[in-house]
Regions:
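Conserved PLP-anchoring active-site segment centered on the Schiff-base-forming lysine
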Residues: 113-131, 160
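Conserved N-terminal alpha-helix of the aminotransferase class I/II PLP-enzyme fold
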Residues: 55-103, 125-130, 136
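PLP-dependent aminotransferase-class I/II
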Residues: 141-179, 183-188, 193-200
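Catalytic PLP-binding core of fold-type I/II PLP enzymes
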Residues: 193-225
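PLP-dependent enzyme catalytic core of the Aspartate aminotransferase-like
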Residues: 2-6, 10, 21-23, 29, ...
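Active-site C-terminal subdomain of aminotransferase-like
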Residues: 150, 177-178, 182-185, 192, ...
Length: 383
């Protein structure tokens, strides 16, 4: 799982950036004697972007709506309202939108809806569907065919070459058929596809009749990043399916699966249920996305995470730390020696990524919609 920007090749990969093993985890002040009158300082957590509950506006809306009876399975008025908000946001009035319980379920459902039973999905080696979905895609009958990652991204020329090799193989009738392409925005390393890159990938996909799927588990952090030159409408124009992540961007849980050109398969509700992605109390998802997409709340809270990450990134650079991967979003990857890991993780939760050949650890610092200025200042002081 190496990046083209990484100076060292990992000797043993422990995990990828989407889910991590946390290290340490007790604040040093929590070990104070029981007789001490000073309260223990709260543990700093920069482990991931799903450690907090939900934005207060969502909790208020859920509380206000708590005793309103509604029909189930996403057939309610609030899911319809959230769907219309998404359609306006992406400038696709006929888009088919479903609210699903989580990211793995969403990816499994989307791929199974798009690919034939013998179809495979093409992804880079570091892709979430290849590394951290416990074989969910394969369990639904779809092989994951991998290409090299380049700072977490897919090269369109390598995708075209893979298709050429498959088409030229006289035995391809006996092989899993490349049937769709999966990428993430932002990537597992927090990097971004720029508009030219995504357009190039989309061109190859359409020339080969391969639906393009964009995993947007961290879409808010991508679109809000200073280096992002695309909009949600651009993604809807270039992709055949994508998700709008809620779990990692302010919601309690849930992802919106969006098909800009309409439903990809008949009886989608049955397919969604088959993959364990259908929530009986579907309005709980609708309420959350209705709030997130009202008055730009989704992007506003994502900007906070990116701003906090930018401040940490500058501090790391100023202090001479080696940052790996050219992320401009809420994920920062830094190579640390064992002593520094021990010192920092005695005071703050970080994510362990992998062990590098030179013995250092690749650690992730991850901000979220809920990260405060004070938390960022306290982390920087520890560096």
């Amino acid at each position: 799982m190496t990046s083209s920007t990484s100076p060292a090749t990992p000797a043993a990969t422990a995990t990828t950036a989407s889910e991590t093993h946390s290290t340490s985890f007790t604040s040093s002040t929590s070990a104070a004697p029981a007789t001490s009158s000073a309260p223990a300082a709260p543990v700093l957590s920069f482990e991931n972007d799903y450690s907090e509950g939900a934005h207060p506006a969502i909790l208020k809306a859920l509380s206000d709506d708590n005793l309103t009876p509604r029909p189930g399975y996403g057939t309610d008025d609030v899911c319809r309202s959230a769907t219309e908000r998404i359609r306006r946001w992406i400038k696709q009035p006929e888009a088919y939108v479903r609210f699903l319980v989580g990211g793995t379920q969403a990816n499994q459902t989307i791929i199974d809806a798009i690919a034939p039973p013998f179809g495979a999905v093409v992804a880079v080696t570091s892709a979430h569907v290849n590394t951290h979905e416990a074989g969910a895609i394969e369990a639904s009958g779809h092989k994951v065919i991998t290409l090299p990652e380049h700072d977490g991204k897919m090269d369109p020329d390598e995708l075209a070459a893979l298709c050429d090799v498959f088409d030229a193989d006289d035995n391809n009738e006996h092989m899993a058929v490349p049937s769709c392409v999966y990428v993430s925005q932002s990537t597992e390393y927090g990097t971004l596809y720029d508009l030219d890159e995504l357009e190039g990938l989309s061109r190859v996909c359409r020339s080969r009749h391969l639906p393009l799927i964009v995993d947007g588990a961290r879409l808010g952090y991508a679109l809000a990043a200073a280096g992002c030159d695309m909009t949600a409408a651009d993604i809807a124009r270039l992709a055949d399916a994508f998700t709008i992540g809620g779990t990692k961007v302010g919601a309690l849980f849930g992802e919106a699966a969006v098909f800009p050109h309409g439903a990809p398969a008949p009886r989608m509700t049955a397919l969604i249920k088959r993959h364990g992605a259908l929530l009986a109390k579907g309005w709980l998802l609708g309420v959350q996305f209705d709030v997130l997409l009202d008055d730009d709340l989704y992007l506003d809270i994502a900007r906070n995470a990116d701003r906090q990450a930018d401040a940490i990134r500058r501090a790391l650079t100023d202090r001479g730390y080696e940052i790996m991967h050219s992320s401009s979003t809420n994920q920062i990857f830094v190579a640390l020696d064992a002593r520094t890991v021990s010192r920092l993780t005695s005071r703050v939760r970080l994510g362990f990524m992998e062990r590098l050949d030179d013995g250092r650890s690749l650690m992730r610092i991850c901000t979220s919609w809920a990260t405060t200025d004070d938390q960022t200042r306290r982390l920087i002081a520890l560096l």
